[in-house]
């Protein structure tokens, strides 16, 4: 890793401290306020420099989209809370370490059954039941699922959140938005796996 400037080190330490204390990275505005930058844009430039040096990864689409590529000073603290899963690589276990963006200090027992991880929602296919783009979906890891449940399913190379309907050797994954057609899966010919069931939603704005 290339050496960091004094300012870059300050930004990195603030990111690490914030993640240890809150379970999530700071926003650009929070970085600017804490370190006395004139604007969030100045914080963004320092984040880009850290990303170029391989210390962090910038995740698009969220104000807290910062992933550390180095361990926190207190690894035990880092592991507290529910892991937040971002993009899932094809063929990789959903809870593989490289998929974990951060950890959120949420009591898993708040959900019934207990949540095992959080999944960042992309898109509005489930909006009619209140699962919106950018939300964090609490998921209980299980393969024991029934018709009508909202599941996290892996279809070939994609992970999707849909309502399950099993029909013999075929599965239908229904959206809760009339603009989306059901996904049909031929179990005899298409890779398919259940990763878990949805047990709750955290509105992403509540964490911003």
From Swiss-Prot:
GO terms for biological process: DNA repair; DNA replication; negative regulation of DNA-templated transcription; proteolysis; SOS response. The keyword Metal-binding does not apply. The record marks 90-91 as: Cleavage. The active site is at residues 125, 162. InterPro entries: LexA, LexA-like, LexA/Signal_pep-like_sf, LexA_DNA-bd_dom, LexA_repressor, Peptidase_S24_LexA, Peptidase_S24_S26A/B/C, WH-like_DNA-bd_sf. GO terms for molecular function: DNA binding; serine-type endopeptidase activity. Belongs to the peptidase S24 family. This is LexA repressor. It comes from Alteromonas mediterranea (strain DSM 17117 / CIP 110805 / LMG 28347 / Deep ecotype).
């Amino acid at each position: 890793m290339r050496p960091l400037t004094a300012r870059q080190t300050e930004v990195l330490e603030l990111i690490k401290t914030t993640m240890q204390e809150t379970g999530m990275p700071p926003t650009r505005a929070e970085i600017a306020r804490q370190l006395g930058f004139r604007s969030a844009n100045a914080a963004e430039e320092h984040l880009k420099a850290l990303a170029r040096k391989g210390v962090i990864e910038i995740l698009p689409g969220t104000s807290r989209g910062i992933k550390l590529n180095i361990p926190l000073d207190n690894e035990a603290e880092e592991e507290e809370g529910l892991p937040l899963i971002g993009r899932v690589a094809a063929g990789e276990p959903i809870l593989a370490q490289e998929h974990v963006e951060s950890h959120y200090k949420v009591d898993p027992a708040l959900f019934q059954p207990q949540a095992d991880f959080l999944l960042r929602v992309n898109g509005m296919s489930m909006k009619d039941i209140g699962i919106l783009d950018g939300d964090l979906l609490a998921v209980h890891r299980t393969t024991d699922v029934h018709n009508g449940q909202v599941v996290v399913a892996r279809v070939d190379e994609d992970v999707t959140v849909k309502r399950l309907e099993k029909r013999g050797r075929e599965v239908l994954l229904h959206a809760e938005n009339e603009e989306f057609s059901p996904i049909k899966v031929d179990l005899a010919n298409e890779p398919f796996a259940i990763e878990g069931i949805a047990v709750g939603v955290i509105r992403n704005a509540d964490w911003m």
